Amino acid sequence: MSDSFFKDIPEFLETRVNESLDARSKSIAQFKELGPPDQVNTIKVNAKNPSKEVGTYHFVSGVDASSSASLAAYLNTLSYSLDKSQQWFGKGNAWRVSHGVYCCYNVFSQVDVRVEAKIPGGVDTYAIDENGQKHIVDARMWTEAYMSEVLRSLLYSDDTNSRFAGHRRFNPIPNPDAELRFFEAAEQLFTLGYTLGSSSEVRVPTHVNNHLVRGIFAYLKQTCRYSAALNLFEKLRVSIPEVSVLLAELYLLMDHEVHAVRILHDSLLKQRMSASLLIVQVKFLISKERYDLALICAKRAVHASPSEFATWACLADVYLHLEDFKSALLALNSCPMYTYYERDAYPLPPSARAHLPFPVNFPKEELEVENNAQNGYTVSTEITDPYLARLPSPSLRGTFAKAYEMLTLICAKIGWDELLRVRSAVFVMEEEYRSLNDITEGNASPDQNEVAEESVAEEVVGLDKPETSVGSLPKNATVQSKRLCERWLDNLFMVLYEDLRVFTIWRAEYTHFKSQGLAYRKAPAEWEILGEVAFRLHHRVEAVEAFCACLESMFSFKAWKTLLIIYSEDNNIELVLTAIAKLTLYNYRWYQEYSPFLLEQMKNRIMQDGALKMKSILASTRLDPYILNLIHKLYFEWAIAFQIPGHEL
């Protein structure tokens, strides 16, 4: 059966032919976001026994979905891969692809566009809706399918929540011709952008705040090719005045601050209560350290859109820069929290067998303990402290993750003890509540369910556990100057306490062992968790220490990615390139040729240091020639195609 698999393409063997296709069809009505990745199903028959057929499937992103011809071409390439596989095993053509189906979800029309190819034979194209009905695919629907595919690639390729095995990822915009097609499609579909939804931090999607706009700016940050977007926004601004805010953001990205300020000024004269314009203005003023003016604009933004998370978070950020931590906590407490929706997925029947081959000539030795580091998550064979594994902070998503990040910034600035003091100064604590209850006659004691959850924990190196705030007050309460702390913020204080507790114990143990002249040892997975904790708490030196200790014993995608962020901020080009090389190789092993994060990092280095210097440094690192060729193919050739400044070799 091994000779029926493709040589270098991941596959899952179906127990029953097309069962995964049926599962996708039944789940179309459940897709709420941009949709799942494209699914490719193939049926293979045995030349010696034509009645014997097997069904396989895999997932793919970044394929040109602008026409049936381009998708049929992808299906056709699979036949060549099967031929190579059989030649590789030194066998005749025992198996051949007889049938292939390419599925691409069109998020605009909410249908699954499918190209069905018989090999040899014709190509059939149709769309399936949530009721299983077939529809004709017209030119408009192809444009929508193309844009849906590109947006999924731009926005989800680096999302660890949507990564799973058997998923090939290609660059959706590999050359200037593809870029032109992208912006032409964006112009046609711009007015429908709000129907796609937006990030988890936005309550109501608008023309200027949606997944389509997010995708455009994600692409611009990768390439810095602003001219096409500039023309697009100038054209759209005539009929959609709100687009002015996108134009201002674009000019700020281009470092054309005078143009940006002029647009903001003119637009705010016409749209005085535009929260989007005011937020851009606030961020600009913060960058210029004019926090007094930023505060005025942030307050206006809150008045303009009090139900949006972004406006309150913006106000809290300004207070943080002003070091008015009481007001920052109050603004944070006022942030509306939204439910986080996971990326679209659907239940698949268990596969009979999985085929996840290494790329040809892949240097396996470069990824130490590779089997313990699949799909971005490391699993150590050593026993990990169960308390570390149960930390709640890694599970935070959306607005809760953003609010927690702001809370950690406040804590990093003033310390845990001062944070507790500020908290008790602005919020009513449980002790005060009980005192009020004792004074107020006829009031029943508060229900224990109304008090934030609290567990008894050991006292840790002088780290005080946060006192619980209350969820309601007696009607005749006399504490007029304090607010009620929202339950979610109360919980975030407990989450922060857990992180601080782990960090404090770790550093205390480390100091003790060092003073005794003893080696401090942890399991690799424990080092990885400790590094994440330190990074969340903005202790960069300790984070680097933990991640490096982790990498001494095992490969960790998380560790290398976080180290890349830190090394980039420190402008350490040698370590940046080493991290990029490791992450690129790991991604390539799992069929990912496109990473917006790595592409942007590489673009920044090319623009700053030049491709020639980077190639010289890479050559001196003694990396395997396979990795050097891979970096040249994925990054340097891309930079040449797009004429990125500094691309000359």
Curated annotation (Swiss-Prot):
What keyword terms does UniProt attach to this protein? Cytoplasm, Nucleus
Keyword Cytoplasm belongs to the record: yes
Compartments where found: Nucleus; Cytoplasm
| A GO biological process held by the record | intracellular calcium ion homeostasis
List the Pfam families hit by this protein, alphabetically.
ChAPs
What name goes with this protein? Answer: Uncharacterized protein C31F10.16
Indicate yes or no for the key word Cytoplasm: yes
Task: Kindly report the protein's main subcellular placement as a broad class.
Answer: nucleus
Q: Which domain of life is it from?
A: Eukaryota
Record's Gene Ontology CC terms?
cell division site; cytoplasm; cytosol; exomer complex; nucleus
Q: PANTHER family this protein is in?
A: BUD SITE SELECTION PROTEIN 7-RELATED (PTHR31975:SF1)
Cystine pairings recorded for this chain: none
